UniProtKB/Swiss-Prot annotation:
HAMAP family: GPH_hydrolase_arch. It is an enzyme of class 3 (hydrolase). PANTHER family: HAD SUPERFAMILY HYDROLASE-LIKE, TYPE 3, PHOSPHOSERINE PHOSPHATASE. This is Phosphoglycolate phosphatase. Mg(2+) binds at residues 8, 10, 186, 190. Gene3D superfamilies: 3.90.1070.10, HAD superfamily/HAD-like. Keywords: Carbohydrate metabolism, Hydrolase, Magnesium, Metal-binding.
Amino acid sequence: MIRLAAFDIDGTLTINRSSTVLCLEAIDALRKLEKNGVIVVLVSSNALPVVVGLKKYIGLSGPAIGETGALIYYGEEEIVATTKYSAKQAYLDVLEKYNEYVYGSWQNMFRLHDYALKIRKQYLSKDNEIYSLIKEYVENKYPYIKVGYSGYAIHLTPKDTGKGKALKQIMEKHGIRREETMGVGDSIMDWEFIKETKIKVAVANADPELRRKADIVTTKPSGYGVVEIVEKILDKPP
C-alpha cells in the first residue's frame, strides 16, 4: 500500500510542459489521495513560498519541497534547510557574463540556496546549447554548485543537496519505507527524487531519459497522466 506520493509541479501537475496552468483534474486526484490516507508531497525547484502557497490553496496538508530540495516545509514552525551553501554568488556571476542569453527569475528574491535563470525568448531554440555553456562555466568555477535544466529554467543548486535528499528526510521523519512510496515527474531533474521511491512514474510527455528510467510511463501527458496513475493506484494498489 502506498503511504506517500511525491509529485513535481511544473509539467507534471500542469496541463502540459509549456504551461503553468494547473490541470484541475490532477488537483482533484491529489485531494483524493489525501482522503485515502496518502501523504502527498509537492517537490519543486520553485521558491519555497510558491510551493507552500500552492499546497495550501489546493488543500494539501503534507510537506513541501522547494528550491530543488534545498528547503523543506513541514509547517509554520518547521522549515528545514538541507544545505549550508548558497548558489547566489555563482548566479550573479552568470547573470553578468551571460546576460545576453538569460535573465533572473522573479522568484530569486525569495530564494536562499537555489537560484534560477530563464532563457530569453529569442534564444529558446538554442536552450540546450545555452544550458550546456552555463553548466560548464559554473561547475568548473564553482565546484560546490551543480547546474540543471528543467525545461522551464536553468537551476544553480548546491551540490550537497537535491530533491532526493529532501524526500528521504521526509520519509525518515514520517517512518515511511521506500516500498510504500511513489514518485511522479516530467523532467530528468525529477529522477533525483523519483529514484528514491518504489513506484517510479514518468508522464507520457516526460523527457526521453526519464521515460527510459521510469517503471511506469503514463499514456496521457502531464496532469492528465497524474490522474491516470492515481486512479490506478487507488483502484488496484501495487
